[in-house]
């Protein structure tokens, strides 16, 4: 593990998803799941989110669209909360969901809107 990339990823992950959520995920990790948590933190958050060529807001919008396209609604809800935390507006969420609905289909759009309304 690249410790510097892990620490950078940990900071990014906490900034988007909340320190409470991340610390709980890491604390609940056991010998079986700890390597996965480390991989997610180092590569998703340290490598991908740590690349400064895209700002966090743009990266978050991309994630919302991609995760919706994959129909991973539990993960989508988590990233929706993160998007709102970093300043993506309700109007921007609505625009993303219109795009998702057109390209991914009505059922995916319906599910995303249902989650977003909560």
Language-model features: locations:
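C-terminal binding/interaction regions
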Residues: 88-92, 96-118
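Mid-chain, well-packed structural core segment of small domains
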Residues: 61-94
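Short alpha-helical scaffolding segments that buttress acidic/His motifs in well-ordered protein cores
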Residues: 40-44, 61-68, 96-101, 112
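Acidic, glycine/proline-rich low-complexity segments that act as flexible tails and inter-domain linkers
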Residues: 1-57, 85, 110-118
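A short structural micro-motif
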Residues: 32, 46, 68, 86, ...
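Residues at alpha-helix boundaries and the short loops/turns that link adjacent helices
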Residues: 16-19, 73, 87, 103
């Amino acid at each position: 593990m690249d410790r510097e990339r892990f620490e950078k990823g940990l900071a990014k992950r906490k900034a988007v998803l909340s320190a409470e959520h991340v610390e709980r995920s890491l604390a609940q990790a056991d010998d079986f799941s700890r390597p996965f948590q480390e991989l997610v933190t180092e590569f998703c958050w340290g490598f991908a989110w740590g690349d400064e060529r895209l700002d966090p807001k743009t990266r978050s919008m991309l994630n919302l669209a991609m995760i919706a396209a994959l129909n991973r609604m539990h993960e989508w809800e988590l990233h929706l909360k993160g998007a709102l935390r970093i300043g993506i507006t309700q109007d921007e969420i609505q625009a993303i969901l219109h795009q998702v609905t057109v390209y991914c289909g009505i059922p995916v759009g319906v599910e995303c809107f249902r989650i977003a309304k909560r």
